[in-house]
């Protein structure tokens, strides 16, 4: 079996680095925050420059948490600009590698299969990573960090943990080095894919690091985590069989689409229903554009300052459709049945599950005629929005004071999208 070498490259403080590059500033010498001041002092900083990180300020802090004596530039988020930079950086990678050997993990992070290129370029894994990082820096002004490993998991952990303690910001891990340096690392939540929930469940058994996981009775892990225990067991030993090729080849049995938003302020039961309709409308148009239908919906509602437990649920529909009127009616039923009326609402997530292409459908002559008319209208709306912008056509409910669609249509990822 071929010995594999993988890389994982992260664009350092990406949004902040882009804003510094656009201003001709050095992110390592400039205090810069990417945030929207109009959201108040509690607004989250999407990124801070490396210079501010060196002052001990946390990356995802809120504006009021930045020490008063620290002077800094505030840059309004420009999501389209960051996407433009990300696409440009991906094109730089493609000058050195085939797209089949690259997996885009996020807007600022990619995995690579270095294996076929090391002999071709006559470079070590570290030298190859440096070549890519220097090309990005030269062409965009954005600095990067990297992790190198003998599998994808080790490359990611080398990036997230090991690289932070190396002068050239490039970490390396094989299974032996992993056991020496990562097995006893704490907190365990620093490890990729281990969140606070998993950590809390492991703590019940006195386990606080991957060494503890590796030496647990596997039957206990399977009882606690089900099928997901396999990932924990493999990763606790530094093992990951999945390859980039397998990721590219993977086709899920069923697909789903979702939409979520954190509201700018507390919403009443009735006002939140307006937003729910808007979010369902957006999902249904996406469903129509995919030429697909759904037979399952899901809803999640979180209340202000966690004053009460979140609510929601998943519902199987007795029909498969992409009709807004049918799907929105089912969402309203689910909302009214599960949502607490007397608590302020701060977050809503909606989802359409079991999405399949509209190849076969049960015969329902009268229902189909009505559906066809509505789908035709939805396709017309999509064409108008694509040509004239998302706000060119809105439902009447989106003109109400508590509606958010008009504002959110100008955003990308919930933030300002302008260049």
What is each model feature region?
Residues 105-109, 149-152, 292-296, 343-347:
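Short Gly/Ser/Thr- and Asp/Glu-enriched loop/turn motifs at secondary-structure junctions
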Residues 18, 313, 317-419:
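Acidic, metal-coordinating catalytic segment for phosphate/diphosphate chemistry
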Residues 1-107, 111, 236:
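Residues that scaffold, gate, or flank divalent-cation-dependent active/transport sites
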Residues 18-20, 44-47, 154-162, 204, ...:
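Short acidic, glycine/serine/threonine-rich loops at helix termini
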Residues 112-133, 206:
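Catalytic palm subdomain of template-directed nucleic-acid polymerases
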Residues 124-189, 349, 359:
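Long, highly charged, low-complexity intrinsically disordered interaction regions
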Residues 8, 200-344:
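DNA-contacting surface of Y-family translesion DNA polymerases
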């Amino acid at each position: 079996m071929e010995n594999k070498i993988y890389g994982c490259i992260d664009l350092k403080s990406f949004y902040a680095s882009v804003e510094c590059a656009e201003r001709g500033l050095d992110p390592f010498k400039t205090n810069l925050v990417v945030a929207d001041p109009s959201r108040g002092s509690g607004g989250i900083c999407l990124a801070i420059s490396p210079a501010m990180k060196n002052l001990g300020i946390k990356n995802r802090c809120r504006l009021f948490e930045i020490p008063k004596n620290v002077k800094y530039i505030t840059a309004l988020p420009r999501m389209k600009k960051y996407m433009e930079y990300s696409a440009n950086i991906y094109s730089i990678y493609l000058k050195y590698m085939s797209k089949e050997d690259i997996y885009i993990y996020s807007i600022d992070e990619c995995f690579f299969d270095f294996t076929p290129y090391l002999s071709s370029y006559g470079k070590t894994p570290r030298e190859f990573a440096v070549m890519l990082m220097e090309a990005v820096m030269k062409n965009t002004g954005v600095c990067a960090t990297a992790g190198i490993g003998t599998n994808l998991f080790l490359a990611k952990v080398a990036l997230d943990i090991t690289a932070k303690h190396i002068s050239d910001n490039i970490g390396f891990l094989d299974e032996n080095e992993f056991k020496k340096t990562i097995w006893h690392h704490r907190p365990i939540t620093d490890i990729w894919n281990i969140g606070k929930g998993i950590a809390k469940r492991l703590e019940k058994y006195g386990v606080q690091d991957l060494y503890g996981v590796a030496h647990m009775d596997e039957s206990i892990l399977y009882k606690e985590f089900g099928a997901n225990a396999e990932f924990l067991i493999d990763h606790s030993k530094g093992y990951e069989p999945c390859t980039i090729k397998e990721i590219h080849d993977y086709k899920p049995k069923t697909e789903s689409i979702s939409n979520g938003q954190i509201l700018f302020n507390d919403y009443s039961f009735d006002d939140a229903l307006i937003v729910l309709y808007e979010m369902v409308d957006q999902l249904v148009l996406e469903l129509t554009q995919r030429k697909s239908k759904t037979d399952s919906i899901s809803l999640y509602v979180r209340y202000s300052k966690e004053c009460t437990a979140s609510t929601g649920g998943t519902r199987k529909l007795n029909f498969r459709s992409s009709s807004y009127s049918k799907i929105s009616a089912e969402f309203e039923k689910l909302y009214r049945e599960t949502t607490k009326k007397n608590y302020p609402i701060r977050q809503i997530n909606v989802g359409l599950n079991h999405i399949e292409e509209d190849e076969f459908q049960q015969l329902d002559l009268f229902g189909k005629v009505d559906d066809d008319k509505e789908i035709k209208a939805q396709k017309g709306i999509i064409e108008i929005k694509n040509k004239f912008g998302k706000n060119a056509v809105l439902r009447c409910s989106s003109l109400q004071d508590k509606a958010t669609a008009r504002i959110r249509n100008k955003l990308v990822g919930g933030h300002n999208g302008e260049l």
